[in-house]
């Protein structure tokens, strides 16, 4: 056997794991193979414990695949492998350079906006060059959305048209819109890409009507290469705007021009929007963005800290991520607060320091999400009684909500499995563990369970 064994394992793990997980937990490991023992060296105890807890089965399975009957013993250590200590050069995940900002001519207002008529339309891109695919942290919660957005950026008008992204506030929908815009313009510098909030479309239409320039308005919006509209739910109950957008939508699709829309809810759940529009929203691909799971939350914090040239210990990132779960914006806001406090006081960023810097935020979070609150919310959602969740009844109409509530308690609180089991009628920790695994499996297999979980997370985190 040679060290290429670990290289083979790395190649398979890179294929099997999300890119952020692989870069954060697996790539930093150094390997040494001798005397039928494969030693894996982690940069610190936190990474070692995490890898051993989360990926040991994956690694052992690969060793069995590659080695057959001559499987080496696996050993974990903290530090660098002996040969590397003299020239310590830790391996880190390579990050592609961000897309270079596209040179654009100075934006000019369309003629309905009270400026003199122009011989050619000038497009307000509004795309933020800072939001790219390279600095979007990928995880299970947003993997499909990012992949779809990437395909649209590479092949606008041809792949997934329209693309409809939906999910709660602060989960990365707007970032992906800008990333698509930047991706399209990186490939074609003169592409006519327009990003806007849905309210801006309404405002532009009102101005066009006031200035007797509705034909100019139509020509502008129907001649773009890509139209990216955020928060489409704000079209609700605006009948004239919906009418105009309906015709704009049809014109763009007929011209193979790309449309990307975002909303805080599934298209058919948007109240106050015409059925014919909601139907069209689903013509292409509709993708949910879920609240980030723990590993992704940790990766987001580490990446944000790195962008600010701040050394954030892994155990501190884990501490914050375990307690703030609702969205990316909340995570980044908390980290900014920690960094500011550290800069003002000159103190090192430790768990105790974070407890102090975020004490009001952490106290509020713990107060808002309790097992009692979860039980009441789940019972109301499934139209059963809290007493049913605590009972011994095993019918599916009760057992499934009970499993859902247990899984949410594990996700949203800091209680141990035995504590959660005790709160559900004195059940043991193995019952809770089975419930969590069952819901995780069903979220992969059942759209309804996935929607239920997302809706309940959104309700409990808001």
Swiss-Prot record:
The protein's matches in NCBIfam families, at most eight in alphabetical order, are given as: DnaA
- Identify the stretch(es) annotated as Domain IV, binds dsDNA: 343-462
User: Where located?
Assistant: Cytoplasm
Q: Which PANTHER family match?
A: CHROMOSOMAL REPLICATION INITIATOR PROTEIN DNAA
The entry's function note states:
Plays an essential role in the initiation and regulation of chromosomal replication. ATP-DnaA binds to the origin of replication (oriC) to initiate formation of the DNA replication initiation complex once per cell cycle. Binds the DnaA box (a 9 base pair repeat at the origin) and separates the double-stranded (ds)DNA. Forms a right-handed helical filament on oriC DNA; dsDNA binds to the exterior of the filament while single-stranded (ss)DNA is stabiized in the filament's interior.
Q: Where is the composition biased (Polar residues)?
A: 112-125
Q: Where is this region: Domain II?
A: 83-125
Q: Which domain of life is it from?
A: Bacteria
User: Which InterPro entries does the UniProt entry name for this protein?
Assistant: AAA+_ATPase, Chromosome_initiator_DnaA, Chromosome_initiator_DnaA-like, Chromosome_initiator_DnaA_CS, DnaA_C, DnaA_dom, DnaA_N_dom, DnaA_N_sf
Tell me which UniProt keywords the record has, alphabetically.
Answer: ATP-binding, Cytoplasm, DNA replication, DNA-binding, Lipid-binding, Nucleotide-binding
Similarity-based family: Belongs to the DnaA family.
- What does the record say about domains? Domain I is involved in oligomerization and binding regulators, domain II is flexibile and of varying length in different bacteria, domain III forms the AAA+ region, while domain IV binds dsDNA.
Q: How does it assemble?
A: Oligomerizes as a right-handed, spiral filament on DNA at oriC.
Q: Which organism is it from?
A: Yersinia pestis
Q: What is this protein called?
A: Chromosomal replication initiator protein DnaA
Cytoplasm among keywords: yes
Q: Where is this region: Domain I, interacts with DnaA modulators?
A: 1-83
Map out region (Disordered) in residue numbers. Answer: 104-125
Residues where ATP binds: 170, 172-174
Single GO MF descriptor: ATP hydrolysis activity
Q: Where is this region: Domain III, AAA+ region?
A: 126-342
Q: GO cellular component terms?
A: cytoplasm; plasma membrane
List the GO biological process terms: DNA replication; DNA replication initiation; regulation of DNA replication
């Amino acid at each position: 056997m040679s060290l290429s064994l670990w290289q083979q394992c790395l190649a398979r793990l890179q294929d099997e794991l999300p890119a952020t997980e692989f870069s954060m937990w697996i790539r930093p490991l150094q390997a040494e193979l001798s005397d039928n023992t494969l030693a894996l060296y982690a940069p610190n105890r936190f990474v070692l414990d995490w890898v051993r807890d989360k990926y040991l089965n994956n690694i052992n399975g690969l060793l069995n695949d590659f080695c057959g009957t001559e499987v080496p013993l696996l050993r974990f250590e903290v530090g660098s492998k002996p040969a590397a200590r003299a020239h310590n050069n830790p391996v880190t995940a390579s990050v592609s350079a961000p897309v270079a900002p596209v040179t654009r001519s100075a934006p000019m207002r369309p003629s309905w906006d009270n400026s003199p008529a122009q011989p050619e339309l000038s497009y307000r891109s509004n795309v933020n060059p800072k939001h790219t695919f390279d600095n979007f942290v990928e995880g299970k919660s947003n993997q499909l959305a990012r992949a779809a957005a990437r395909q649209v950026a590479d092949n606008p008008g041809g792949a997934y048209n329209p693309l409809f992204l939906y999910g709660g506030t602060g989960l990365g929908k707007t970032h992906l819109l800008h990333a698509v815009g930047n991706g399209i313009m990186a490939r074609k510098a003169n592409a006519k890409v327009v990003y806007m909030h849905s309210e801006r479309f309404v405002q532009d239409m009102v101005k066009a009507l006031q200035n007797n320039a509705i034909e100019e308005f139509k020509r502008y919006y129907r001649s773009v290469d890509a139209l990216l509209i955020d928060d489409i739910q704000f079209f609700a109950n605006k009948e004239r705007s919906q009418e105009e957008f309906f015709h704009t939508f049809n014109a763009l699709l007929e011209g193979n021009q790309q449309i990307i829309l975002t909303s805080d809810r599934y298209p058919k759940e948007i109240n106050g929007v015409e059925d014919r529009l909601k139907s069209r929203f689903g013509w292409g691909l509709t993708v949910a963005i879920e609240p980030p799971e723990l590993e992704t939350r940790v990766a987001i914090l580490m990446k944000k800290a790195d962008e600010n040239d701040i050394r954030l210990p892994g155990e501190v990132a884990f501490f914050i991520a375990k307690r703030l779960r609702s969205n990316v914006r909340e995570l980044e806001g908390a980290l900014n607060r920690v960094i500011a406090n550290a800069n003002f006081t000159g103190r090192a960023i430790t768990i105790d320091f974070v407890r102090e810097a975020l004490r009001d935020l952490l106290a509020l979070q713990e107060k808002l999400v309790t097992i009692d609150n979860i039980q009441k919310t789940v019972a109301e959602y499934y139209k059963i009684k809290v007493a049913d969740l605590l009972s011994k009844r095993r019918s599916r109409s009760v057992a499934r909500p009970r499993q859902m509530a247990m899984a949410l308690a594990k996700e949203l609180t800091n209680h141990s499995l035995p504590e959660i089991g005790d709160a559900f009628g004195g059940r043991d920790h193995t019952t809770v563990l089975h419930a969590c695994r069952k819901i995780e499996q069903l979220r992969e297999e059942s759209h309804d369970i996935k929607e239920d979980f997302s809706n309940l997370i959104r309700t409990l985190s808001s």
